[in-house]
UniProtKB/Swiss-Prot annotation:
Protein name: 4-diphosphocytidyl-2-C-methyl-D-erythritol kinase
Reactions catalysed: 4-CDP-2-C-methyl-D-erythritol + ATP = 4-CDP-2-C-methyl-D-erythritol 2-phosphate + ADP + H(+)
Family: Belongs to the GHMP kinase family. IspE subfamily.
Pfam families found in the cross-reference section: GHMP_kinases_C (PF08544), GHMP_kinases_N (PF00288)
Signal sequence segment: none
Record keyword Kinase present: yes
Species, as recorded: Nocardioides sp. (strain ATCC BAA-499 / JS614)
Length: 297
């Protein structure tokens, strides 16, 4: 199974609720960077991982600590079956980068194990299980472009008439999502209870208007991420000086994404940023499909 990375085209964050969670209004877009999860029958349970050269060997937790273990446990408990199988994760989505790579793995694992175990779980039940795993997991199942509300886990597909090109620059060190939210709370103690709506962004993508999209991109967590990691602000400035229509921190960071006008524009910007000393620079288009079958092993 293959599942995509996501970028947040809009991320409005409200003040924390009594339960500690922040209400969100976000627009997700699935982009063409993928993790692959392969599931094979086996008498016991095991999870392995393959990483590209630019990822640290310890970037993905194993030994029962991976989100795919929790996905398997939830699916098995839902149907009253035993957790068995051999899963292998081939990573390509930046880890701890604000692009929901772990959520993509969980979504792919749910679909792969549902097929492996012959369960035929309904789409509604898969989405409910996904929401229990994390706010980004339901979207990784759906893909495309979608509006997320609540904690981001209530996902509604939206009209998107564009094909958008992005340059993605991951960081060699992660940035803790909880710490970014805590820093947001410190920086903005008077944040409104209701998040900034996404009307301008939704209008831009419905019209397929690249310049309107560039103007409408919004991330309330960007200031907190840049305050914690000032080099992210310098990277965004560098990308925009090199011709990006707009750059921003993806989600809670530290990955930065840059909107480009075409595939050629994206390749040119990627080459420029790579030449400026960034060791990993990726180009990707969106929107793309959510978790889907690639082949049976």
């Amino acid at each position: 199974m293959r599942a995509p990375a996501k970028v947040n085209l809009h991320l409005g964050v409200g003040a924390p609720r009594e339960d500690g969670f922040h209400p969100l209004v976000t627009v997700y877009q699935a982009v063409g960077l993928y993790d692959d999860v392969t599931a094979r029958a086996a008498p016991d349970w095991s999870v392995g991982v393959g990483l590209p050269d630019w990822m640290d060997d310890d970037a993905v937790p194993l030994n029962g600590a991976n989100i795919v273990d929790r996905a398997a446990d939830l699916l098995a408990a839902h149907h009253g079956v035993e957790r068995t199988g051999e899963l292998h994760i081939a990573k390509a989505i930046p880890v701890a980068g604000g692009m929901a790579g772990g959520s993509a793995d969980a979504a792919a694992a749910l679909v792969a194990l549902d097929r492996l175990w012959g369960l035929d779980t309904s789409d509604d039940d898969l989405l409910a299980l996904a929401a229990r795993l994390g706010s980004d997991v339901p979207f990784a199942l759906l893909g495309g472009t979608a509006l997320g509300t609540g904690r981001g886990e209530v996902v509604t597909p939206v009209q998107d008439r564009g094909t958008w090109w992005w340059v993605v620059v991951p960081s060699d060190t992660g940035l803790s999502t909880p710490e970014v939210y805590r820093h947001f709370d410190r920086m903005f103690p008077d944040a409104p209870s209701q998040p900034v709506p996404a009307d301008a962004l939704l209008g831009a993508i419905a019209a397929g208007d690249t310049w309107a999209l560039a103007d409408a991109l919004h991330n309330d967590l960007e200031a907190a991420a840049i305050d914690l990691r000032p080099e992210l602000g310098r990277l965004i400035e560098r990308g925009e000086e090199a011709g990006a229509l707009r750059g921003l921190v993806s989600g809670s960071g530290p990955t930065c994404v840059f909107l480009c006008g075409s595939a050629d524009h994206a390749r040119s910007l990627a080459a420029d940023l790579s030449g400026a000393g960034h060791p990993v620079v990726l180009a990707a288009n969106g929107p793309v499909a959510g978790a889907h079958l690639v082949s049976y092993a």
